[in-house]
Amino acid sequence: MIIVDNITKYYKVHGKRNVLFEKLSFTLNSGGRLAVLGPNGVGKSTLLRLLCDVERPNEGVITRTGTMSWPIGLTSGFINNLTGRENIRFICRLFSCSSAEQELKIKFVEDFAEVGNYFDMLVSTYSSGMVSRLAFGMSMAFDFDYYVIDETLAVGDSYFRQKCFDLFKDKAADKGIIMVSHDMETVKQFCNQAIYLNKQQLFFYHQIDDAIDLYSRAS
């Protein structure tokens, strides 16, 4: 369960407060599948970072009773002067994986990412597409109670995108999901409730179609 209690988030710009949202509250039950909708610039990605505990609210409290992924496919966490294999091992150690678990996860990512010999080369030599494939594979190598998606659910060409889509669908079948997306077909497939953010306010919808209708009319 995730309980968001009266949170406010702002950034100081030139000494002035730029308020993204204030006094937001909602509860997502275990296994809940939540879409975060709204116009650009209203703080959807910031809200995800708050939920993942990457950032903290200026006011209010977020309580979590389950584990949360980092945003699926996030590429900024790699260390460029390590190889793909070394990066995955490093993340495994951060999660206190046993030696046997490390080898299983490394093998999974190596097979899924399909980067060939580059898996044992420095990440700094990768193309952007290769980094994305490695990142998605790493995201899927770990089990979480909630999976977080910030726009990108699949990467690469049509073949690899379908591969990502199929794997995520299987991986998250009985898990919670928190998704920011402008693709309403994807939202319909994976989410059953939504929040709509706009003008520093939050509107919670228990029926996904109601939220999509509002989003479509406002777009």
Residue locations for each model-derived region?
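A short, flexible loop at the N-terminus of ABC-type nucleotide-binding domains that lies
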Residues: 1-4, 9-30, 35, 58
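ABC-family P-loop ATPase nucleotide-binding domains
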Residues: 10, 14, 67, 72-158
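ABC ATPase nucleotide-binding domain signature region
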Residues: 33-35, 39-93
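Conserved H-loop
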Residues: 73, 182-189
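Conserved D-loop/post-Walker B switch-helix segment of ABC ATPase nucleotide-binding domains
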Residues: 157-166
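Conserved catalytic loops of ABC-family nucleotide-binding domains
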Residues: 167-179
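H-loop (His-switch) and adjacent beta-strand-loop-beta switch element
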Residues: 190-207, 215
